[in-house]
Amino acid sequence: MAYTNKVTISAAVATMMLFLAVTIVDAQSMPPMPKFNPVCALADLPNIVQLCYFNLDLTPSEECCNDLKSSSTIQVNCLCDNFIAHPSNGNISQARYDLVNSACGVADKFACKGGDASGGSTNKIAASMVLLGLVASLFF
């Protein structure tokens, strides 16, 4: 009669049952995460958003307006794609964006309507190449 280790077999069966249970059970559906452009991680967005839009003053500060006026094309595209065109990403209303942008005189610069305007049309292939270059520079 062959010797079988019951502990090993029972551990293997328990592990198999655990994996089957995980695959059979339906996962809770999570709300879709916004697609974040990797180039936007390099743009200094948190400071601009915090300084200008999370502040509840009726008139934006001079520093806020200067930051908005001197923001680069990448920053404008990232703000349009991730915050202004989708206000639910930052829990800031569209009226707040409009108020701050109008008060600072940059309403035309930040005029993006859900991605159909010219703002926010970042080239995805170029962004992925930049990310690939950054990752490759870490290894070589």
Curated annotation (Swiss-Prot):
Q: What is this protein called?
A: Non-specific lipid transfer protein GPI-anchored 33
Q: Which InterPro entries match?
A: Bifun_inhib/LTP/seed_sf (IPR036312), Bifunc_inhib/LTP/seed_store (IPR016140)
Q: Which residues form a coiled coil?
A: none
Its primary localisation, in coarse terms, equals: membrane
* Described function: Probable lipid transfer protein.
Residues bearing glycans: N91
Task: Give lipid-anchored residues (GPI-anchor amidated glycine).
Answer: G115
**What's the protein's topology in the membrane?**
Lipid-anchor; GPI-anchor
Q: Give the subcellular location.
A: Cell membrane
